[in-house]
Amino acid sequence: MIPRPPSDDRANQNGDGSKKTGAKKTGAKKAAAAKKTAGKKATPAAKATAAKGAVTKKTGKGKATAKKAVADKAAAKATVPQQAVPKQAVSKRAVSKKAVPRKAVVKAALDIPEAPVSPAVAPDDRDRLLSGTHHAPHSVLGAHPVPGGVAFRVLRPYALSVTVVTDDLRTELHDDGAGFFTGLLPLRAVPDYRLHVAYEGTVHETEDAYRFLPALGELDLHLINEGRHEELWTALGAEPMTHQGVPGTRFTVWAPNARGVRLAGTFNFWDATAFPLRSLGSSGVWELFVPGVGEGELYKFEITRPDGSKTLRADPVARRTEAPPRTSSIVHASHYAWADEAWMAARGERPVHESPFSVYEVHLPSWRPGLTYRQLAEQLPAYVADLGFTHVELLPVAEHPFGGSWGYQVTGFYAPTARLGTPDDFKYLVDALHRAGVGVLMDWVPAHFPRDDWALAEFDGRPLYEHEDPLRAAHPDWGTLEFDYGRREVRNFLVANAVYWCEEFHIDGLRVDAVASMLYLDYSREEGQWSPNEFGGRENLDAVAFLQEMNATVYRRVPGVVTIAEESTAWEGVTRATHDNGLGFGLKWNMGWMHDSLGYVQHEPVHRRFHHHEMTFSMVYAYSENYVLPISHDEVVHGKGSLVSKMPGDWWQQRATERAYLGFMWAHPGKQLLFMGQEFAQGAEWSETHGPDWWLLDPAYGAEPDHRGMRDLVRDLNTVYRHEPALWERDTDPSGFAWVTGDAVEDNVFAFLRHAADGTPLLAVSNFSPVVRHDYRLGVPDDIPAWHETLNTDGARYGGSDVTNPHPVKPEPQGRHGRPASIRLTLPPLSTLWLRPA
């Protein structure tokens, strides 16, 4: 570390990497410095003291050599003014001796023998080190055996002097100018040593970063080269560690096109000059172990591009970041102790597609604006558990600079957003949800990344994470860049990232965003704006291979998790196993069902008969994939209105239609997802700036019962759903569903049976007309003695008209809908009924 300059200005640490350094000496100060040193000669007493402080365990010849060196230095200083050096202020974090006046520092320096001058740093090495383009700084800097002893070379801009200190010696190095200090000591081997670096007003004691062997192993480099490092976050980024017995932090970054990489941060006051990284062979990885640097330090990589320009970049594998709009990475090590052992042990007991699975979708920053991860942990788990949802799905948690992107333009793929707290704080939230019996899904965005010039875009001066072909790099819809899935290191970066969230944060599943944009080379592109694959087709074969590898790796390493695809096309085999040439996802969002069903209920009841097929068509393909039925954030923003506001009619009819719709949705084959705020019929569409309108549930609000009734319905839907295996056990098996009537077009009625694995049925009936239908006859199996109404969305407690079937309904031996028996029901207006065997 070096002391802080007079002004610690990090305002320009982004972009091109330019930075402000400590103030230079003025001409007057230079003259004063020269005056202090000019004409001073070592007295005999000083010489004797210096000789005594030299290498005390050497031979008499060695002592004489040290004495002569001190005398020569004193004579030289008598005639040559000392070179002026830019000054720096005292470091808050420096391990420093007591600050002393500059005059005393100079005097103290005269009492320390100066090492004989070693061969100076070669001009080429000197230029490359100062320009930040040296691939092997450790081969020049540090201590190296040479003919005649051990050469010490140190780069410390702004230092007044540098002294090598071991158990046996204390010797000042020669000032070669421009921040270089060198010396040749008559030693047979490189000793354990430290550096005393004198700046104006302080002496700083430190380890020499350039005396350490690489802190990254050959196996790590091999796996990175192969694109197979499944724990990439343990090899790249900032890793606090003890290396060769010394605590510090290893910094590593993949930048194969860089001419040089240096490290800037709070520990060197954003001056990277003295902190060049070394290139580790042909891997493209650069590494530097910095002793004394620990958790909480801010840092970035200063990269010299192929054209010689510089750019200051955040760490792509940073595990913690500053809160936006700041962009620095932060050295981090987790100390969290998990308490969700029971959840983790039971997580993989039953396949997700054969389990109850209802999801509450949440945007954490706006669910309760202003709350941190730990504060959310006090409220969110209890709320979700009370409503009976099995999982929450979090909109992207990974760090993103623009809050208005909702997290879908990620810059920090390995760091939870710092807006709400630290990575360990986020673990605390996940832990709390697990202990409440709620699983945690997370939106994951491997489709694209933003163009911010401090992040991934042209990271080392050339396309690196993005594709080299401009037709494949730029995403036309979002102005972002698409990943180069064909590059093994990029694919590894993403696959390891998926594993990282599941293993390190105990995430139970990943919902992969914008899969369709990854699969098709011509996605949102006109003719001439895209380039075909090697076979002339429009399929992105590299993306297919990446998704298959990601899914296979996650399922192999983290049993019990689920991956979910947001895929809006008819791509075949999205949820088919990779060994059967599928993409390997566990579930897929059923975008077709969502669009069709919402389209149906938005029509006036009198017109719904012309759109009856929109509610039945989904069963034509319901078993082609394993589906989730999503009413997500995308459907309640950008002028689309909230769910209840989509419904026609007056306020009562709107709420009744939403209740009927949710009842139909929860009974339909597939898993359920509902975005926050829709569970209590929020009228306004969602905004990330203020979140749900919780005031609607304030008892002092006159219409509070209407909103509370909707929330009570959602709670009961989840409760009955979880206890009725017929609604989830055969979600992916055609034998688990049968239409009773799917063609009651004039009545706006739909009725179907769901079957559990043991054959136990549940009858679901929806009436999307605003009239009561008495004695409505429906065909049923003849082996059920009676049916009992287990849920009615028109119940009074939900805000309905309370038209019910209060008594068990017995079948009559009158065939209907191709079945030998039938029952007569009273169908409430705009409602859904669930009936089970009494």
From Swiss-Prot:
Family affiliation: Belongs to the glycosyl hydrolase 13 family. GlgB subfamily.
Complex formation: Monomer.
Segments of skewed composition (Basic and acidic residues): 1-11
Pfam families: Alpha-amylase, Alpha-amylase_C, CBM_48, GlgB_N
GO biological process per UniProt: glycogen biosynthetic process
Protein name: 1,4-alpha-glucan branching enzyme GlgB 1
Source organism of this protein record: Streptomyces avermitilis (strain ATCC 31267 / DSM 46492 / JCM 5070 / NBRC 14893 / NCIMB 12804 / NRRL 8165 / MA-4680)
Pathway annotation: Glycan biosynthesis; glycogen biosynthesis
Root EC class: transferase
Catalytic activity of the protein: Transfers a segment of a (1->4)-alpha-D-glucan chain to a primary hydroxy group in a similar glucan chain
Residue ranges with Low complexity bias: 29-57
Documented EC number(s): 2.4.1.18
Source lineage: Bacteria, Bacillati, Actinomycetota, Actinomycetes, Kitasatosporales
NCBIfam families xrefs: branching_enzym (TIGR01515), PRK05402.1 (NF003811), PRK12313.1 (NF008967)
Keyword Metal-binding among record annotations: no
